[in-house]
A protein has these predicted regions:
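Carbohydrate-interacting/catalytic domains
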Residues: 1-170
C-alpha cells in the first residue's frame, strides 16, 4: 500500500497526512511516559468524564510515576463543542500538546488557539476547570504548563498572619 503515498491530488494528500499523523502520534507516545509508564495500573489512569453521551465526549487523565499528568479529551460527534468545560486536577495554564485536527494530519486546525487558563469552579468533582473548543470528530491532549498558587495555601497562610495582627493590635 506504500504506492498510495505517491498518488497525486487529494487522494495522495490524504494518505500522506495519515502517514504524518501516525509518525507524530508514535513519537508523541514515546516522548510522554504518562501514556505508557503505568499502563497496567489504575494509578496511571483516571476518568474525568465517561458518561457524557449527550455530547458524545469523554475526558480522562494519564499519569506517570513522577505524577506528571496529561488530560485527554475526545469529541466523537460531528458537531463543534465550543465552551466545553471539564474539571482538571491542577489549577493553572493548560497547553494543547497534540490535536488530531492539526492541518498536518488533514485537519482544519480548529480548537483552542493558545493556552487555556483554569478557573476556580467546581466541575467533575474538582475545584478547578478548563473550558475548551473541541472540533468535531477529534481528540486533543493537554498538559498543565504553568501551575497557579493553591487557593487553600493562600487561606492557610492568611490565618497565621491574621492571628499575628490581632496580637499586635492588643
Amino acid at each position: 500500500d506504500w504506492h498510495l503515498l505517491e498518488l497525486e491530488g487529494e487522494d495522495g494528500d490524504r494518505h500522506r497526512a495519515l502517514k504524518a499523523f501516525f509518525q507524530a502520534v508514535n513519537a508523541f507516545y514515546l516522548a510522554h511516559p504518562e501514556l505508557w509508564e503505568l499502563d497496567f495500573s489504575w494509578e496511571g489512569f483516571e476518568w474525568i468524564e465517561a458518561d457524557d453521551n449527550q455530547a458524545n465526549t469523554i475526558a480522562f487523565l494519564r499519569k506517570d510515576k513522577k505524577g506528571s499528568t496529561l488530560v485527554t479529551v475526545c469529541n466523537f460527534s460531528p458537531v463543534d463543542r465550543t465552551g466545553y468545560t471539564i474539571g482538571v486536577p491542577t489549577a493553572g495554564t493548560y497547553t494543547c500538546l497534540f490535536s488530531t485536527d492539526d492541518p498536518a494530519f488533514g485537519g482544519l486546525g480548529r480548537g483552542d488557539a493558545g493556552p487555556v487558563k483554569s478557573q476556580y469552579i467546581e466541575c467533575h468533582g474538582r475545584g478547578q476547570a478548563i473550558t475548551l473548543s473541541l472540533p468535531p470528530m477529534s481528540a486533543a491532549i493537554y498538559k498543565c504548563t504553568r501551575k497557579f498558587p493553591s487557593r487553600r495555601k493562600k487561606s492557610a497562610e492568611a490565618a497565621p498572619k491574621a492571628a499575628k495582627s490581632d496580637k499586635a493590635a492588643k
